[in-house]
Amino acid sequence: MKKIKVYPVILSGGSGTRLWPWSRKNYPKQYLNIIGENTLSKTLSRISSIKGNFFLMQNPIVVTNEDQRFLALDNSITYIKNTKIILEPTGKNTAPSLYLASLYAKDMNKTDEDSVLIVLSADHWIKNESYFNKSIINSIKLALLDKVVIMGVLPVNPNTGYGYIEMAEKKREGRINYNKVLAFHEKPSIKKAKKYLEEGNYLWNAGIFSLKNEIWLNLFNKFEKSNAELINNSWKKKIFDNHFARPNKNDFDKVKPNSIDYAVIEKIQNCKYELAVLSLKCGWSDLGTWGAIKEINHLDKHNNYIKGEVVSIDNVNSHIMSLDKKMIGAMGLKDIVVISTNDAILVANNSKLDDLKILLKGIGKKNKSLLNDHRKVFRPWGWYDELDSGDKFKTKRIHVKPKSSLSLQSHMFRSEHWVVIKGKATIFLDNKKFILKENESTFIPKKSKHRLVNNENKMLEIIEVQTGNNLSESDIKRFDDVYGRKSK
């Protein structure tokens, strides 16, 4: 019997602002070590492990944005050796993202109309993976019967942070039990959420879907015709760049944002395709809030979640995390969240966390960079940590991965001093090439062409001291870059 091809689609473009200061725009929650490893890697390993006798799981398709491309690549390459990561030119919500992925899947599988998409978010936590995998296999079976399958989670509390699915009558296909969908409901008030919990026929909308690729293409073209035309044109003009697929920006910028639910799923009841909901009972969270992080972790006898360098005395129902090496001393707190990073601290009452975006607006007015980047900034070649800065100087600790290099570049307004702390550096400076070992240093004059290379099999660490009138990251002129980056 011919096996069906199944394409997992991982949507990984979110910013995770509700987990500030841990999650930032350029290093959002799907790349954080929340559950022992980052959730993108965990999602990829989980879906890649699913096997069945009637289908072939294909390489996952990751959809993200330009700013996160190297983060996505670094965390995908273990599981996806030959895939393309689709880079949206601009964020347009989840429906256009999925349509791009479906066009890619169609290109990979032009002769088979029965291929199935499994749509997943990159930032979900699953407790019982065996049960989850069985649910995914059941969803594939239902999708092959031309059903559009959505996963719901049985509520364990009156959560106001999720949309809800109202279930209709129970149905059965073979050994698979599912429900028809009666209605979708927006994130409710606490009063409504309690009502949903009491009535028992509501599920949290987990945002996990399974359906035939051809059905998604047809539905999107039916309900989002103008967007479909623009995305089709954008995809036709795409550029492949190593692991990345870049749709045309001019066409894609004209696309109107819309979610999968609003654009298509909530309109399916008027179509020939049955909308089926499977109940997930495997332990699930979208890790979208500090409350959600607390819920999945071990709590002490006073209902506190404590992590890192923390001394906690007489605290109740609080969440205290030291995410750097700072010691936090906390005493007599009740219903309080304290999150410490190396450049920002959040202190809030549990009841005010839904208003975090108001606080972030104020922080953005004072120091916008705190919303975008950590002090430790990741690059395709490694990372740097800004240790100190002041009038006309900046000090960085720079780590370069094995067999990696920075771009050949120059700076108009700054000079640099490099000291090797660990490893061996190969330096290109104008027409010279030389080696620096541990405890050796060099000076990089402004306007000189230079490049830092690690040809070794272990990490290279240097301390860089910048001096000059303009120490901005925009003061980089690139002459050659192995990662395809251009000067800002």
How should each PLM-predicted stretch be described?
Residues 40, 101, 123, 165, ...:
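Residue-level signal for inorganic ion chemistry
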Residues 126-254, 272:
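Conserved core of the sugar-phosphate nucleotidyltransferase
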Residues 462:
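Noncatalytic nucleic-acid binding interfaces
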Residues 4-6, 57-58, 81-82, 112-115, ...:
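Short coil/turn connectors at secondary-structure junctions
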Residues 91-96, 157-159, 190-192, 284-285, ...:
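A short acidic, often aromatic-flanked loop/helix-cap motif at beta-alpha or helix-coil junctions
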